[in-house]
Structure formats: C-alpha cells, structure tokens
Amino acid sequence: MNPRTSIRVHEAKKGESNMKQTAMLTTASLLTILLMTIHMTGDILFKMAPAGLINLLVIFIFVVQLYGTLLLAGRRAGYIIIFFGSAIGLLISVIHMKGTRGVLGGDIGTSGQAFLFVWTLLALGITATFSIILSARALLSLPWRRSRRASTAA
C-alpha cells in the first residue's frame, strides 16, 4: 500500500470521526434544550418556579444555547456555550434530586405527573452530562493559539 494513500485514508477517517462527534454534540445539546424546556414547564405548573416575566431570562438563556448549538457548531465559542448551557442542565437535575423541594417536594409527589417529571430530570441529567463531555473533548482538542505563520500568511 502506498504510504501517501494510507495517510489520506487515516485523515479522512479522522475527519469523519470529528463530523460524527459534532453531530452527536449537536443532537445531545438539542435534546438537553428540549428537556430543559419541558422541565421548566413542569416547574411552573407545579409552582416550583414563578410564572412571569422572569421566564424571559430563561428563554434568553435557551436561545443563546440554541445559537451556540446550531450556528456556532464546530467552533470554540459554540463549544463553550454548549458546555455552560449543559452545565446548567446538569445543575437543574442535581438541585431537584436533593433538598426538601427536590423530586418529591411541592405538589409533584402527589401528582399523577410525577413519573414524567422525574423521567425528564433523569434524561436531562444524562444528555447534559454527555454534552459536557463532548464539548470538553472538542475544546481540549482545539489549538488554543494560531501560529504566527498562519496569521501573517492570510
């Protein structure tokens, strides 16, 4: 086998892997956003979060994460936004798993919707953690500085 051909095949496989990771991260981040919105709906319905204008801030946070996921996919800024947005999603799960206002706090424990609420928290924790891992891997694999040759050649 020609050494040049094997290098090209290896580079193509590496590029395919990078595209698969980007697709996985995009999918996991979109699922995290979806589960966070479902969760926020439950929080409002179960009176664990206030209904009102404060939710405009929540909408803004979701829009920023959506922007980072879709429009900044594969870029450092997108990975950073996804990392912190997913950390918020994981934090939501952790907060609800502990304390007096946790999973069975408020009106949730006596509701027929308790299963969906708890399932959403578990799924949110899974997708958020997966998004954190993938975005951290992507950030660590990027070069942090451009070489002077690359910037002066342009």
Segments from the language model and where they lie:
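C-terminal TM-helix exit segments that contain a strictly Trp-centered aromatic cap at the helix terminus
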Residues: M36-F46, A87-V103
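Loop-to-transmembrane helix junctions at the membrane interface
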Residues: T69-V94
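Cytosolic juxtamembrane helix and N-cap/initiation of the first transmembrane helix
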Residues: I7-T32, R137-L140
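Alpha-helical transmembrane segments in multipass membrane proteins, preferentially the mid-helix core
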Residues: F62-L72, L134-S135
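A cytosolic-side transmembrane-helix exit/cap motif
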Residues: L72-R75, K98-S111
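Cytosolic juxtamembrane helix at the C-terminal end of the final transmembrane segment
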Residues: I133-A153
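Loop-to-helix transition at the N-terminal end of transmembrane alpha-helices
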Residues: M48-V63
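Individual transmembrane alpha-helices with interfacial aromatic-anchor signatures
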Residues: T110-A128
